[in-house]
């Protein structure tokens, strides 16, 4: 039986996205994460990994310098997983690259408070 977006289990789409992301094929990864997101929106977002679909798609957007597209995904991922410091750190990078230094510094400080050491480097370098 062929898989279509309406009957494909979400996890394979997510893991295929991860494979593409690890191969630096960000456009294909974005497409797979987008399908996983579409499926989750249709069938419920209570599955524990849904935040990661948004986080990973946002990370891919960040890698291809489509930072303005990454910010809403990082923000939604934080809605689903509000104590994830890595999401704050990466959204901070996206904010900084889009000229929103105040928001970037706020996110980096939050990430630092959640144990992300690299965020402290950003705070020291860019938030004086």
Residue ranges and their predicted role:
Residues 1-128:
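Alpha-helical tetratricopeptide repeat
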């Amino acid at each position: 039986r062929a898989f279509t977006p309406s009957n494909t289990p979400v996890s394979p789409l997510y893991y295929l996205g991860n494979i593409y992301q690890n191969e630096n094929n960000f456009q294909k990864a974005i497409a797979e994460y987008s399908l996983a997101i579409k499926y989750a929106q249709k069938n419920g977002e209570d599955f524990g990994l849904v935040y990661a679909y948004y986080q990973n798609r946002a990370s891919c957007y960040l890698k291809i310098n489509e930072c303005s597209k990454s910010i809403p995904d990082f923000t939604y991922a934080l809605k689903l997983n509000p104590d994830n410091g890595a999401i704050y750190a990466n959204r901070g990078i996206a904010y900084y690259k889009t000229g929103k230094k105040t928001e970037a510094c706020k996110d980096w400080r939050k990430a630092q408070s959640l144990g992300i050491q690299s965020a402290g480097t950003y705070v020291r370098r860019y938030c004086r």
